[in-house]
Amino acid sequence: SIPGWESLLEHACGECGDGVVLGLGTVLTNEDVSKAIDLGASFIVSPYVSQDVMEAATIEDVAVIPGALTPGEVATAYNMGADMVKIFPASSVGGPKYIKSLLGPVPDWELIPTGGVTPDNAIDFFRAGAAAVGIGTNIAPADKIRSGDWDSVTDAVRDFMDRLNRQLEEGIQ
């Protein structure tokens, strides 16, 4: 949904090389799935369960991570071939407690909470059973992106990862 995403993805894939796995979100159409794969994306994230996007990702043999909120939507996503499911907006519906509740009856679901995940609460989502977290404006604010202040964004990402890794080393329990 970002204008010019194609050149950004191509540049990122070229800069990062094989050691980094890059994907693309927010993917809304099967045409964008094909473009993203051609440019080097290894996975696709969509904001909701889209049959077209799911089928295109399956045909392209790349991981697909649709967005969902309710247990029924999550089940539908997995029934359609999702590799993981993005839960959005996680913090607005109970945060880590909601993730734990979703996983209660189906502990095998791999959920990625997004929306309101911060450096302060990310570990709580992992403790609740999240497979990964999605964090955006809390470490990469729009004003920093617009101004091209990549050093600040890089520092914030590094700080977040260092903090999270320390917490993970201390243990999830």
Give residue spans per PLM region.
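Active-site-adjacent beta->alpha loops and helix N-cap segments on the catalytic face
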Residues: 1-16, 30-34, 44-79, 89-105, ...
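Short glycine/proline-rich, acidic loop/turn segments that cap or connect secondary-structure elements
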Residues: 123-137
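Hydrophobic faces of well-ordered beta-strands that scaffold small-molecule active sites
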Residues: 20-25, 44-46, 64-67, 85-87, ...
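Generic C-terminal helix-cap and adjacent flexible tail
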Residues: 163-173
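CE4/NodB-like, metal-dependent polysaccharide N-deacetylase domain
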Residues: 79-80, 163
